[in-house]
Amino acid sequence: MALALATTASAQENPLWLRHCAISPDGSTVAFAYKGDIYTVPATGGNARQLTTNSAHDSYPVWSPDSKQLAFCSNREGSMDVYVMNREGGAPRRLTTNSGTETPIAFKDNNTVLYVSSIMPTAQSILFANGSLPQVYEVSTNASRPRLFSALPMMDISIRPNGDLLYHDQKGYEDPLRKHHRSPITRDIWLRRAGKYTKLTNFNGEDRTPVWAAQGDSFYYLSEEDGTFNVYKRNIDGTDKQQLTRHTTNPVRFLTAATDGTLCYGYDGEIYTLKQGAQPQKLKVNIVTDKTDKDLDRQTLFTGATE
C-alpha cells in the first residue's frame, strides 16, 4: 500500500527555532543547531554555513578556548555520542562510544572536552544512585579513554584557564524547560575554586547557565527573578547585581560569552547578541541550503495498516 505524507518545506531566510547557540571565544562566529544539523554564522549576522549534513540529529555545539574546534553530540551511530570537528567543518571525530546519552558542556582546555552522562560510576564516587542525575566526564580530543571529572552533577559549566569553575547544580529531576518553578530543588549557581565549593546565588527560583566575565571577578547568568528568564550580571562576592535584558514573553536560553564580553543567547527561537553598555541585537541569519524535506514521502507497507 502506498502512503503519501505531506511535509513542510525548509525555511531559508529568518528561520525560527535556532537552538543551542554559542558564540566563539574570539567573538567572530556563532554556532547553533537547526533541524538536526550544526551551523555557524558571523557574529554580525549573514549567511549561515552548514557544518554537518548527516541524516542523524546533531546538537549542542561547544567551542574550544582557541575557537578552532567545535564539540557536539550526534546519534549517527545510534545513541548520542560526543564528536569534535574543525570550525570550518569536515569529517568529525567520534570521542565517546557509550550506549547512553553523552552531551558536551564545555572544553576544559583546547584538547579536552567535558560532557555529562549517566554512566553510573562506582558506589564510592556517585552522589545518588539514579541515572537522572548525570556525572561529568572528560575525554581528550584524540579520543582517549574517558575519565570521571565529577560525580557531583554540574550543568552548564564555565571554566577559566586557571581552573576556576562555575556551574549550576541539579538537585532533583525537574524538567529544565519548566518555567516559573519554585521549590527546594530549583537550580543555583556555584563556584569551584581550588577544591572549595561556594554557593553564589540563593534566589528561591531558577538561577542557571553561568558564564565568566573577562576579568574573572564577575559572571553573567540567567535568572527568573523578574518573572521570566533574563540575563543578569553580578560580582563573585554577590555585590553589584544588574539585570541586563528585560524580555517578558518568553524565557532567554543558551547564554554564552566571548572573551571581549559580547554575550549571545537564544530568545523566541532566534539568536541575540549583547555588547557591554548596549541593547540586545537580533542576529539576522539566512540559511542557504538544499531542501532536505520531501513534499511526499512514499512508503510501501505490507502489514500493520488500520483504518
Locations of the language-model features?
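Short N-terminal segments immediately surrounding and downstream of signal-peptide cleavage
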Residues: 12-27
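A flexible loop/linker signature enriched in serine peptidases of the S9 family
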Residues: 13-15, 33-39, 52-58, 71-83, ...
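Short coil/turn segments that connect the beta-strands within blades of beta-propeller domains
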Residues: 26-28, 66-68, 110-112, 162-164, ...
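Signature of short aromatic-glycine-proline-rich micro-motifs recurring in repeat-based ectodomains
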Residues: 18, 153, 302-307
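Sec/Tat signal peptide C-region and signal peptidase I cleavage site
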Residues: 7-11
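Conserved beta-strand position repeated across blades of beta-propeller domains
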Residues: 22, 62, 106, 158, ...
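Bacterial N-terminal signal peptides
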Residues: 1-6
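Beta-propeller domains
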Residues: 40-44
